């Protein structure tokens, strides 16, 4: 099962359109956030646990209909939705096998009251994101953490060694993998990357491979795409 959370002022249908995650051999859930937002952001109307309860309710309903593998439930999301994916991975690690935030907004509330239980994590972010800066900043009068800060926290939580391996995956992006972790931790740094789901139809940069973020997220989750005939 993959939960895919849309960005602020977006909706589930748009997330489905640009992510193409339903090409995966998995049950993909595209929820709609109340007022087009998700918990953890200062503008969300669901702060206080409402969206986490919503996710749990969806899972309960799914298990009554489908033979859900409870050890293979994952979450990803874009921007505010990426921050929410990080939040539920932080606070509900026993439910999720892994998370993959993309261009995520890591407001301070995202990492409040984190469990000490490790969770597999892949972060994807563009270095020139003008909306949610790679180096952190302030939006809606609220501070959000930088990508390096978030990865440092995740490395401690997953008990990773300081050593990492970095290699180029294409002309626009590098991948960094931490060593010795209890559960995997990886980061894809998109050079000159904008605020987008990298490789989506609306990402017009020629140096970013088509469906790059989707392919990397599914690879990290260990999920293959449905074969095309």
Regions found by a protein language model. Give the residues of each.
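Acidic catalytic loop of the alpha/beta-hydrolase fold
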Residues: 129-132, 195-196
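Primarily recognizes the serine-hydrolase "nucleophile elbow" in alpha/beta-hydrolase
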Residues: 71-119, 130
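Alpha-helical scaffolding within the catalytic cores
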Residues: 13-20, 105-113, 170-176
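Serine-hydrolase catalytic machinery in alpha/beta-hydrolase-like enzymes
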Residues: 1-74, 78, 83-87, 91, ...
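Short beta-to-alpha linker loops that shape the active-site pocket of alpha/beta-hydrolase fold enzymes
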Residues: 32-36, 105, 193
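Short beta-strand/loop motif that positions the catalytic acidic residue
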Residues: 123-125, 129
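Extracellular/periplasmic catalytic domains that process cell-envelope and extracellular macromolecules
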Residues: 20-24, 67-68, 91-94, 113-117, ...
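C-terminal catalytic histidine-bearing segment of alpha/beta-hydrolase fold enzymes
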Residues: 124, 145, 157-229
């Amino acid at each position: 099962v993959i939960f895919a959370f849309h960005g602020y002022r977006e909706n589930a249908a748009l997330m489905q359109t640009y992510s193409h995650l339903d090409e995966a051999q998995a049950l993909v859930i595209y929820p709609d956030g109340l007022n087009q937002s998700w918990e953890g952001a200062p503008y969300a109307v669901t702060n206080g646990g409402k969206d986490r309860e919503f996710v749990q309710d969806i899972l309960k309903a799914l298990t009554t209909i489908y033979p859900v593998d409870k050890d293979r439930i994952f979450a990803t999301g874009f921007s505010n939705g990426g921050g929410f994916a990080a939040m539920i991975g932080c606070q509900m690690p026993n439910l999720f096998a892994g998370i993959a935030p993309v261009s995520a907004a890591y407001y301070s509330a995202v990492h409040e009251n984190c469990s000490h239980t490790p969770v597999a994590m892949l972060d994807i972010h563009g270095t020139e994101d003008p909306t949610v800066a790679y180096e952190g900043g302030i939006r809606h009068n609220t501070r959000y953490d930088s990508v390096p800060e978030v990865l440092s926290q995740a490395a401690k939580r997953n008990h990773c060694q300081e050593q990492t391996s970095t290699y180029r995956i294409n002309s626009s992006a590098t991948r960094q993998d931490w060593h010795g972790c209890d559960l995997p931790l990886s980061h894809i740094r998109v050079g000159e990357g904008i605020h987008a789901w990298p490789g989506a139809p609306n990402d017009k940069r020629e140096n970013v491979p088509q469906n790059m973020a989707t392919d990397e997220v599914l690879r990290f989750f260990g999920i293959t795409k449905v074969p095309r005939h």
